[in-house]
Structure formats: structure tokens, C-alpha cells
């Protein structure tokens, strides 16, 4: 007898379009003999809308994350980041169907939902691993907080009226100090997110690197930096100067930073796994997602 298959469905069930998509996906999974799994809250929302889907089970209470085969994510990049948090450290890849705006991490659009689910059921996808960050906060010699991020760990000022006074470091060595609104430390995946909005470079996801991008720095040397993926980056809030800060990991997990706190970011050994239906050059994804103008391109001339 074949083992029971479990697929997690992550949807923003507070939105009508996302809830409807979640209902559609659950029906398609059940028709294929696969058990849909949802978080407790999203399962309640789903059953309130469609009581006949009572065979849908709850994540954790009935099915542990380690038993999941796949995660189907219905929404934009924020929903994908939430899904990555739910299954952190588990082998199940994330298959994103964009219901948001840019949806840079998503693999398909709403019109292709049924086809995307069918390919997920058939295991007709490739798995791409994306690097993540580990973030550690130290006050003196004490580690007071630890977290992780797929996109970025950002140190921001806690008070709009006070700038942050920081020292930035690479590989345990001081590089510069300045006043700023914050500092973004990013993965290549995050280079098209907050880092990009702050003026950082786009880094191809296959590049092993970390990025550091100052936010509105009052300094002559405040350029974005790209360092080796095995380097460490750190931001230290100067004692007795500037305001207090907040560490945000992927814009989801926050920790208040007192003056003197030091945030150290390194490459995490735990990647996020993405299910890819359309493998191809990252350039094509960049052009498609950002609707970049390429009119007039005549193709390689044979001399490349």
C-alpha cells in the first residue's frame, strides 16, 4: 500500500481571491488522493467557507512538517516568506503561485494554477536551493537573540527623530562608521527585495555572496558592498550616540536593539528549497517580473 501523501497549502485566507484559490487547490489535491494540510487558522477559514472540505488536516497537530512532500504557496513574496518560516529545515520544496504584485519568488501566475498543481502532484519540477542568513544579536558577550532570513536582516532606527550611529564590519574588522536610517544585510535572493529598493545591486541567485546596503547614510563612504558568502557581516550600534534600533528578519521577525548591541550575520547552513516549473536563465525571470524594456534586441551575433 502506497504511503499517504501530504501537501501543505499556504494561502492568505483573509483575502477572498486567495481563499477561493485555496479551496480550488484543496479540491484538486483530494481528487488525486492527496491530503491537503493547512495551518490551524487557515484551516478554520477554509472550513467556514467550504464545510465539505473537512478532510483537510492541520499542520503540526495532525501532520508534522517533516512528513510534507510539497508546499503550495498562494500569494506574493510575503506569503512565500511565511511559508518558508512554517517549514524551516524541512525538505519539502515551496511551489509559489503568484496572487500578489511582482511575486519574484513565485513560479506561476493565477491563470496557471490548475496546471501548476497538476505538475506538483506529478513531481514534475526541479528543486533549487536558495541561501539563507543566520542573524545573531550580542550585547556585550551575551547572545540575546537569534533568527534567520531568506531575503534580508535589516537594522533600522526605532525612532524617526533620531538617526542610528553605527559601525559596519566585515570578517570581524571595522570598515566605517556613520549615521544612517539603517543597514540591510541581504542574500542574493534578497537583492531584488528591500536591498534593491535601497539602491543595492541585483545579484544572480547562483552567486555565493552576502550584500550590505546602508540606508540614507550620512557618509562619504556608504556604497553597497558585496562580500564572499563565507564572510561575516556585522552592524554595531554605538553606545552613547544616536538612537536605538530594531532588527527585522524578512520584515516578519523583529527584535529591539539597545545602544551597544551588535548584529552579526552569516550564511546559514539551512537553505530554502524552491520547486521550479520553468527552469531557465535568471535574466529572463528578471525581465519578466520587472517588465524590463528589451525591445530592439536582435540576439547574440556569434561573437560572444
Swiss-Prot record:
Tell me the disulfide pairings in this chain: none
Q: Report the gene name.
A: nadK
Active-site residue list: 77
Task: State the name under which the record lists this protein.
Answer: NAD kinase
Q: What's a BP term from Gene Ontology annotated to this protein?
A: NAD metabolic process
Q: Which GO terms describe its molecular function?
A: ATP binding; metal ion binding; NAD binding; NAD+ kinase activity
Q: Which family does it belong to?
A: Belongs to the NAD kinase family.
Catalytic activity as recorded in UniProt: NAD(+) + ATP = ADP + NADP(+) + H(+)
Q: Which GO terms describe its cellular component?
A: cytoplasm
Which cofactor(s) does the record list? a divalent metal cation
This entry's Enzyme Commission designation comes to 2.7.1.23
Record-listed NAD(+) binding positions? 77-78, 82, 151-152, 162, 181, 192-197
Amino acid at each position: 500500500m502506497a504511503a499517504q501523501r501530504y501537501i501543505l497549502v499556504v494561502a492568505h485566507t483573509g483575502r477572498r481571491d486567495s481563499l477561493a484559490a485555496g479551496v480550488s487547490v484543496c479540491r484538486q489535491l483530494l481528487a488525486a488522493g492527496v491530503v491537503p494540510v493547512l495551518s490551524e487558522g487557515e484551516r478554520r477559514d477554509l472550513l467556514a467557507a467550504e464545510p465539505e472540505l473537512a478532510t483537510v488536516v492541520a499542520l503540526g497537530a495532525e501532520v508534522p512538517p517533516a512528513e510534507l512532500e510539497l508546499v503550495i504557496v498562494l500569494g506574493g513574496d510575503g506569503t512565500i516568506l511565511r511559508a518558508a518560516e512554517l517549514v524551516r529545515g524541512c525538505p519539502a520544496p515551496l511551489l509559489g503561485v503568484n496572487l500578489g504584485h511582482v511575486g519574484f519568488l513565485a513560479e506561476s501566475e493565477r491563470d496557471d494554477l490548475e496546471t501548476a498543481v497538476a505538475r506538483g502532484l506529478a513531481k514534475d519540477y526541479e528543486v533549487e536551493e536558495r541561501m539563507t542568513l543566520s542573524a545573531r544579536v550580542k550585547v556585550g558577550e551575551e547572545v540575546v537573540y537569534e533568527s534567520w532570513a531568506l531575503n534580508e536582516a535589516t537594522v533600522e532606527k526605532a525612532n524617526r527623530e533620531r538617526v542610528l550611529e553605527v559601525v559596519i564590519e566585515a570578517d570581524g574588522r571595522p570598515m566605517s562608521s556613520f549615521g544612517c536610517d539603517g543597514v540591510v544585510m541581504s542574500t542574493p535572493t534578497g537583492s531584488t527585495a528591500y536591498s534593491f529598493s535601497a539602491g543595492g545591486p541585483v545579484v544572480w541567485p547562483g552567486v555565493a555572496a552576502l550584500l550590505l546596503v546602508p540606508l540614507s547614510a550620512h557618509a562619504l563612504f556608504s556604497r553597497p558592498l558585496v562580500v564572499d558568502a563565507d564572510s561575516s557581516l556585522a552592524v554595531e550600534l554605538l553606545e552613547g550616540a544616536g538612537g536605538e534600533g530594531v532588527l527585522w528578519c524578512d520584515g516578519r521577525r523583529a527584535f529591539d536593539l539597545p545602544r551597544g548591541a551588535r548584529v552579526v550575520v552569516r550564511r546559514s547552513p539551512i537553505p530554502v528549497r524552491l520547486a521550479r516549473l520553468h527552469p531557465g536563465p535568471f535574466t529572463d525571470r528578471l525581465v519578466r517580473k520587472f517588465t524590463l524594456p528589451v525591445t530592439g534586441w536582435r540576439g547574440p551575433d556569434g561573437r560572444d
